Curated annotation (Swiss-Prot):
Low complexity compositional bias, start-end: 152-162
GO BP term, example: protein localization to plasma membrane
TM annotation in the entry: 20-40, 43-63, 65-85, 223-243, 258-278, 307-327, 344-364, 377-397, 464-484, 500-520, 571-591
Bilayer topology term: Multi-pass membrane protein
Signal sequence range: none
GO MF annotation terms: glucosaminyl-phosphatidylinositol O-acyltransferase activity
Start and end residues of each stretch annotated as Disordered: 95-121, 149-172
Species of provenance: Cryptococcus neoformans var. neoformans serotype D (strain B-3501A)
Protein name, entry field: GPI-anchored wall transfer protein 1
Top-rank EC class of the record's enzyme: transferase
InterPro entries membership: PIGW/GWT1
Role noted for this protein: Probable acetyltransferase, which acetylates the inositol ring of phosphatidylinositol during biosynthesis of GPI-anchor.
Gene from which this protein is expressed: GWT1
Glycosylation sites: 560
């Protein structure tokens, strides 16, 4: 066992990495996989097996067998997607004869004369519903769509029964008969109180759709954001075990000192994603209300907690992740498990980083009164880079590990870099959060509430696309300039170019998922609800990311102590990886099915 441990540690050490563009090419498989799901979703059952075969298995194949030709594999998946998208357009967009709804404006071919007044109310019941003029439609809409029909200002019956007297007698017997009396108003039942009322005739009356705004799930969740985070989790889960097999290319494993690889960007992406969804919880608290009387200012009791109390609250929330870190530490040290010390240190692991980064973000939050999250992240990264260049870098690359700080020098020294990534993720999250905010309640006469929300969402989505394009170009330009000036990327140090690379990578692929949901043909999006745009398996992994990540770590350890992974043939390696990924998928699936969220 001792010889195998040394061989295994040598197996995962000394990796020079690969080019950034080859890593982007491998990651394109994730976008192609999501496009495949969108194309196939109208034709399949959304059970666990189909979710796994479409959402997980292509990713596994993309980072292992097809990692040497990722563009070919992504193109193959894209061709299948385009075929089914074209098929869906023919299936759902067949021509239909236009059907004129009842109670709408008259066409030019219809008569402009008012309907004849029936002799009696009894006779009117047998008459077929009459077509209405524009003024009559506006009158009917105002009376039927009122939230309280008993107080309609234009309804004679409501006035007589309202309890108010009519001293002038204008609402009594001598009133002018309404042209709508005796006419059967067959107004469609779908018009309800959600339609906005206007004192002027509406230009058009549209059916109020019962479905949610396309592209927005319940509780403001966004499909593209859910899929992005779930795919990031999936690729991390796959790689942490696949790296132990020969079928996983060495250049995709973590680099030793400097370099770029798929697993290097995956670590930073995990932190970036955590910041992306922490925007609400880390937004600056609103200022306490100030009394209108200046005399009361001296008696104000501050209701806003102090920064220290916020830090303690955040630390308390991080306790479960810290506990997981200590559990992993005990298991690794107690089982003589092969470990790569230069990743984080002797005792440090990634759970400690995940637990401490949000606490540090709360500590620097008061600075957001003057600086944006992204600017603050860049400043911290540049200051960290200065410390690395002139003091810390020689110490980190040395062999000395005496004392608790030197033993875990990689973990401690990389915290400012991961904090910068987290803050940049918060900045992008601010922009994404605006997409789920409801529109202002404005007076609209030509569209329903649902249509108004849909148009608002589309405008905000286009704004977000343009913002992400700008941020992506900016981060890539910053990274390119730094590398051109001679800088090198180092995950071990979490230096400034590594921060810029993680920001550029994640902003670009978040933009890719958003574009996929934006360019979906209307024929598919009309038949595919927002809940179907997010595969159930990916939604389950997104909701229970911590449980899925913990299960993946436990299963990875179980596989490594059960077999000599580095000597396994390709067919056995792929079989184990498929069973492993299916087992992890089942964990998230079962938790979601039982409505358990960890």
């Amino acid at each position: 066992m001792g010889d195998y441990k040394l061989a295994k540690e040598a197996f995962v050490s000394g990796n020079p990495g690969a080019s950034i563009w080859s890593i982007n090419a491998v990651s394109l498989v994730a976008l192609a996989t999501y496009a495949l799901w969108i194309a196939l979703s109208p034709y399949i059952r959304h059970g666990l097996l189909n979710n796994y075969l479409i959402c997980v298995l292509p990713l596994l194949l993309g980072v292992t067998i097809f990692s040497t030709s990722p563009l070919v594999f992504a193109s193959f998946l894209s061709i299948i997607s385009l075929f089914f998208i074209a098929k869906s357009q023919k299936r759902f967009n067949f021509p239909r004869s236009p059907e004129k709804p009842k109670g709408q404006w008259l066409d030019e071919s219809d008569s402009d004369e008012e309907p004849a007044e029936p002799a009696s109310a009894a006779g009117s019941a047998a008459v077929s519903p009459a077509k209405l003029l524009p003024s009559q439609v506006a009158f009917a809409s105002g009376s039927l769509l009122s939230t309280d029909p008993t107080i309609s200002p234009m309804s004679p019956s409501s006035s007589s029964s309202s309890g108010h007297e009519d001293p002038l007698g204008i609402m009594g017997v001598n009133r002018r008969r309404s042209p709508l009396e005796g006419v059967s108003l067959d107004v469609p039942s779908h018009i309800d109180s959600k339609v906005r009322i206007s004192p002027v005739p509406s230009l058009r009356l549209k059916k109020s759709r019962a479905t949610k705004v396309q592209g927005v799930e319940e509780k403001g969740r966004l499909p593209f954001l859910t899929v992005y985070r779930a795919h990031m989790m999936l690729m991390t889960v796959i790689c942490i075990l696949a790296v132990d097999f020969e079928v996983f290319p060495r250049w995709q494993g973590k680099c030793e000192d400097f370099g770029t690889s798929l697993m290097d960007v995956g670590v930073g992406s995990f932190v970036f994603s955590l910041g992306l969804v922490s925007t609400k919880s880390l937004s600056p608290p609103p200022p306490p209300p100030t009394p209108t009387s200046p005399a009361l200012n001296s008696h104000i009791i501050p209701l806003t907690p102090s920064p220290l109390s916020f830090i303690l609250i955040s630390l308390r929330k991080s306790v479960p992740v810290l506990v997981l870190g200590f559990i992993r530490l005990i298991m690794v040290k107690g089982s003589d498990y092969p470990e790569h010390v230069t990743e984080y240190g002797v005792h440090w692991n990634f759970f400690f980083t995940l637990a401490l980064v949000p606490v540090l973000a709360v500590g620097v939050r008061p600075l957001t009164q003057w600086l944006r999250w992204s600017v603050l992240g860049v400043i911290i990264s540049l200051l960290h880079q200065l410390c690395l260049t002139y003091y810390l870098q020689p110490i980190i690359f040395s062999f000395g590990r005496s004392g608790i700080f030197l033993a875990n020098k990689e973990g401690f020294s990389s915290l400012p870099g991961y904090l910068s990534i987290f803050l940049i993720g918060l900045s992008i999250g601010d922009h994404v959060l605006r997409l789920s905010l409801p529109p202002r309640r404005e007076r609209v006469v030509s569209e329903t509430i649902e249509e108004h929300e849909q148009s608002h969402f589309e405008r905000k989505k286009l704004d977000l696309i343009m913002e992400l394009i700008g941020y992506s170009l900016g981060w890539w330009a910053l990274l390119g300039g730094w590398i051109w000036a001679g800088g090198e990327v180092s995950r071990r140090l979490a230096n400034a170019p590594y921060v810029f690379w993680v920001a550029a990578y994640n902003t670009t692929f978040l933009l890719g998922y958003l574009l996929l949901t934006h360019i979906i043909p209307s024929s598919i999006s009309s038949q595919t609800s927002p809940s179907i745009l997010v595969p159930r398996l990916l939604d389950a992994m997104n909701k229970n990311g911590l449980a899925v990540f913990l299960a993946a770590n436990l299963l990875t350890g179980l596989v490594n102590v059960s077999m000599e992974t580095m000597y396994a043939p390709a067919w056995l390696s792929m079989g184990v990886l498929m069973l492993y990924s299916l087992a992890v998928s089942c964990v998230g699936w079962v938790l979601k099915g039982r409505s358990i969220k960890i």
